[in-house]
């Protein structure tokens, strides 16, 4: 009979105790690490380090960065980690001038806000005040200014809301270069053309057109103006076809005086 191996238990007991002690130490270290990490997190969230440190705003044109930050509801006391991007975006797009908004968190404590504003397609002149008209047809009656704008044409003599709405749609279809070349658009209906308008261009010409064909006709304005003698000003008629009538006699200084078609 083969003799079996003899295991000396006294030799294994110290090793088992050492393993148990090491295992207990590792467990204690893990518990202590978790505890201190928890304490650090609590201190971080309660300290200024856990609050929003900076808000960056981009894409705004007419609304100031301060106004947009105020609309977002974010302050220096706001917890960085409690900022909900989607909720802030919804708050911002409730403003009539903001078309789109994107909010992004950037470590360690910066909030980046990018907005797209509705384009100001024109300004309605009423009671010596210029009211912005957005491309979506909304008139900003609370944003009126006494200073004449230069970024969009001014609508003068427009009282008919339906006519303004139709004109807004036409202006929105125009290239930016043509829209920027206009100074004023006067509502001047006649018996023959009930939707007739007179456009005063920045280059000194006048354009007589109708609202219903405004975008289609005015989109060709650069080519039409380029074919004319720049030293001879007058009225470009675009109601039916297109033709040019020079001022005769020379145009007076009265801004409301126009040449009848």
From Swiss-Prot:
Subcellular location: Cell membrane
Swiss-Prot/TrEMBL keywords: Cell cycle, Cell division, Cell membrane, Membrane, Transmembrane, Transmembrane helix
Extracellular face residues: 49-261
Swiss-Prot/TrEMBL domain comment: The extracellular region contains three distinct subdomains: a membrane proximal alpha domain, a central beta domain and a C-terminal gamma domain. The alpha domain might serve as a chaperone that stabilizes FtsL. The gamma domain is required for interaction with other divisomal proteins. The beta domain might modulate protein-protein interactions of the flanking alpha and gamma domains.
Keyword Translocase belongs to the record: no
Transmembrane segments: 28-48
Domain POTRA: 50-118
Primary role: Cell division protein that may be involved in stabilizing or promoting the assembly of the division complex.
GO cellular component: cell division site; plasma membrane
Membrane-side (Cytoplasmic) residue stretches: 1-27
Residues covered by region (Alpha): 47-117
Protein name: Cell division protein DivIB
UniProt topology in membrane: Single-pass type II membrane protein
An example Gene Ontology biological process: FtsZ-dependent cytokinesis
Family, as annotated: Belongs to the FtsQ/DivIB family. DivIB subfamily.
Annotated stretches, region: Beta: 118-230
Pfam families for this protein: FtsQ_DivIB_C, POTRA_1
Matching Gene3D superfamilies: 3.40.50.10960, membrane protein fhac
Organism encoding this protein: Geobacillus kaustophilus (strain HTA426)
Keyword Cell division: yes
Region (Gamma): 231-260
């Amino acid at each position: 009979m083969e003799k079996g191996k003899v295991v000396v238990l006294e030799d294994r007991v110290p090793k088992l105790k050492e393993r148990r002690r090491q295992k207990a130490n590792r467990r204690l270290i893990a518990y202590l690490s978790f505890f201190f990490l928890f304490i650090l997190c609590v201190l971080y969230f309660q300290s200024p380090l856990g609050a929003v440190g900076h808000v960056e705003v981009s894409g705004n044109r007419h609304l100031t960065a301060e106004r947009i930050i105020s609309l977002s509801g974010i302050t220096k006391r706001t917890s960085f980690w409690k900022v909900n991007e989607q909720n802030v975006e919804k708050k911002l797009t409730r403003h009539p001038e903001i078309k789109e908004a994107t909010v992004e968190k950037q470590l360690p404590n910066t909030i980046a806000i990018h907005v797209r504003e509705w384009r100001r397609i024109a300004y309605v002149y009423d009671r010596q005040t210029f009211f912005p008209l957005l491309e979506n047809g909304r008139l900003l009656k609370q944003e009126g200014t006494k200073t004449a704008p230069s970024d969009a044409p001014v609508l003068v003599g427009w009282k008919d809301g339906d006519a303004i709405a139709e004109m807004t749609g036409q202006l929105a279809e125009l290239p930016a270069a043509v829209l920027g070349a206009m100074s004023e658009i006067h509502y001047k209906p006649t018996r023959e053309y009930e939707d007739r308008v007179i456009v005063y261009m920045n280059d000194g010409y006048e354009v007589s057109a109708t609202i219903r064909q405004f975008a289609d006709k005015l989109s060709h304005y650069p080519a039409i103006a380029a074919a004319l003698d720049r030293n001879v000003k007058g009225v470009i008629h675009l109601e039916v076809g297109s033709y040019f009538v020079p001022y005769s006699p020379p145009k007076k200084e009265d801004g409301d005086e126009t040449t009848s078609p």
